[in-house]
Swiss-Prot record:
Region described as Disordered: spans on this chain: 198-236
Subcellular location: Nucleus
Protein function: Sequence-specific transcription factor which is part of a developmental regulatory system that provides cells with specific positional identities on the anterior-posterior axis.
Feature: DNA-binding region: 140-199
Molecular-function annotations in GO: DNA-binding transcription factor activity, RNA polymerase II-specific; RNA polymerase II cis-regulatory region sequence-specific DNA binding
Major place of residence: nucleus
Listed name of the protein: Homeobox protein Hox-C6a
GO biological process: anterior/posterior pattern specification
Family note: Belongs to the Antp homeobox family.
Gene name tied to this protein: hoxc6a
CDD domains reported for this sequence: homeodomain (cd00086)
Keyword Transcription regulation (UniProt): yes
PROSITE patterns: ANTENNAPEDIA (PS00032), HOMEOBOX_1 (PS00027), HOMEOBOX_2 (PS50071)
Motif placement: Antp-type hexapeptide: 121-126
Amino acid sequence: MNSYFANPSLSCHLSGGQDVLPNVPLNSTTYDTVRHFSSYGAAVTQNRIYAPFYSPQDNVVFGSGRAQYDYGSNVFLQDKDVLPSCRQTNMGLSTQSHIAQEYSLDQGRTGTQEQKSNIPIYPWMQRMNSHSGVGYGTDRRRGRQIYSRYQTLELEKEFHFNRYLTRRRRIEIANALCLTERQIKIWFQNRRMKWKKESNLTSTVTGSEQTGGSQEEREDRGGATEEGKDEDKKKE
C-alpha cells in the first residue's frame, strides 16, 4: 500500500473554481507539489494554501510504520488538558535550575569566607589608617589625625586671634587647609583644653610663688625682730 493517496472525501473547492489539491497521480512519489504534514493535513507548498477539513473517520493513517493521529472532535480538548501539565513541568524545571544556582552561589560564598578566615593576620595589618580610620584587623577604632606642619602653623595663628570660630570661618579654613569642618572643630576643642590646662598650671605656679615669697618675707621679718630684741636686752 502506498503511503500517499488521494482521499475523495477531502475534496474542497475555492471561490475561483480552483481545487485545493491538483490532479496528482496515485503512484507519485515526488515531494515537490504535495508535501505531507503529520498533524495538520495536506497543504500545497507552492501557493502555501492550507485548507481545513473534516474527516468522518475517527482515525486517519498517514504512511506505514507511523503512529495513528486522532483528528476527531475531542482533539482540541485534549490539547487544552495537556497545556497545564506542560506548564507545570516547565515551572518545575525552572525552579530546580534556580535552586541549583542558589546552591552554587552559597557554596562560593562559604568558600570565600573560609579563605578569608584562613588568612593569617599580622600586627602590622592591624594598624589604623590615620586619615580614613579603617584598619585590617578586628579593632575598628579611628586613628588619630596627623596634621602637617603648615596646617598646624595656620591653625595656631587662627587660635591666637580667635579662640572660638564661627561656622563660616570654619568652612573657610577647612577649604584653605584641605581639611574637613569636623577636623577643624575637633582641633580647636583640643587646643582650648590644652590652653586651659596651661593657664591653670601657670596660675597655680604663680600663686605658689607668691605664697612662698610672702612666707619668706614673714620669716625674715620675724628673725629681724627677734635679733632686735636680743640687742636691746644686751644693752640693758
